[in-house]
Amino acid sequence: MSELKLVVAGAAGRMGRVLIQTAIETSGVTVSAALARPGSLALGQDAGLLAGCGEINVPITEDALAAIVDADGILDFTSPDLSVELAALAAQARIVHIIGTTGFSVAHLTKIEAAARHAVIVRSGNMSLGVNLLAALVKKTAAVLGPVYDIEIAEMHHRMKVDAPSGTALLLGEAAAQGRGISLSEHEQRGRDGHTGPRKDGDIGFVSLRGGTVVGDHTVIFAGPGERIELAHRAEDRRIFGRGAVQAALWGKGRKPGLYSMLDVLGLGGE
């Protein structure tokens, strides 16, 4: 069987380098191209050398259209605007697009959904096995405990993260909302300040902390009468996201076009 040829977008960034490393280390996968933004100092450098893996004869380029020629998929942890552009290219080429980018607007998501009519797109706020298992647990717990238990989601990331709440926190919030059979957008409460009054019944609260080099900490709190349940995940190594992304690309090869999540990849979509 031929190797899965993957394009790594955002190759010069922290996650881009992790994706290159992971793809190189994974049997049956090869890095066929690597992308960086126009003007990046990484342009022209060998992707393998930049990622600390040794030379792989893949120079980093800014030409996304040329990069996807003969590729089977794109690994994309970049920015909302760029992810939308790459989704359109993936749709044209009928290839797999793995999106780990966060911070999307409704308009961004609408465009990605449109692209998924012609491409296999796996989008998730977190690609790790642990977080997606946590999401399944959160959904089940929310359903069992019911609205008498208040739900709060706390997350902490490194000081350079630019969006809040994190994509993972929103993923967990959506899981909680699904467990209760409600809409997250109608019940989310992002931060509190000043005289807020009593907590509203049914709210799902979010609090975001930023500092240091924290890869990602998430805790879902179910606070009920006389007791509190906490479900948590601590990310200690970005390679967990890289492994999940490559696993998703392997899973997506040959599937029918559509918008999928990591829950689908892990066989938890029906949970």
Curated annotation (Swiss-Prot):
What residues bind NADP(+), as annotated?
R37
Report a single Gene Ontology molecular function.
NAD binding
The source's superkingdom equals Bacteria
Q: Which Pfam families match?
A: DapB_C, DapB_N
UniProt: (S)-2,3,4,5-tetrahydrodipicolinate binding residues? H158, G167, T168
* Residues that, per the record, bind NAD(+): G10, A11, A12, G13, R14, M15, G100, T101, T102, S124, G125, N126, M127
Q: Which reaction does it catalyse?
A: (S)-2,3,4,5-tetrahydrodipicolinate + NAD(+) + H2O = (2S,4S)-4-hydroxy-2,3,4,5-tetrahydrodipicolinate + NADH + H(+); (S)-2,3,4,5-tetrahydrodipicolinate + NADP(+) + H2O = (2S,4S)-4-hydroxy-2,3,4,5-tetrahydrodipicolinate + NADPH + H(+)
The top EC class, named as a word, is oxidoreductase
Q: Where in the cell is it found?
A: Cytoplasm
Q: A GO BP term, please?
A: lysine biosynthetic process via diaminopimelate
Q: Which residues are the active-site ones?
A: H157, K161
**Annotated keywords:** Amino-acid biosynthesis, Cytoplasm, Diaminopimelate biosynthesis, Lysine biosynthesis, NAD, NADP, Oxidoreductase
The region called Disordered is annotated at: 183-202
Q: What is its EC number?
A: 1.17.1.8
GO CC term, one of those recorded:
cytosol
Q: Does the keyword Amino-acid biosynthesis apply?
A: yes
Major site of localization recorded for this protein: cytoplasm
Pathway the protein contributes to: Amino-acid biosynthesis; L-lysine biosynthesis via DAP pathway; (S)-tetrahydrodipicolinate from L-aspartate: step 4/4
Record's compositionally biased regions (Basic and acidic residues): 185-202
Family designation: Belongs to the DapB family.
Protein purpose: Catalyzes the conversion of 4-hydroxy-tetrahydrodipicolinate (HTPA) to tetrahydrodipicolinate.
Q: What is this protein called?
A: 4-hydroxy-tetrahydrodipicolinate reductase
Give the organism, scientific name: Beijerinckia indica subsp. indica (strain ATCC 9039 / DSM 1715 / NCIMB 8712)
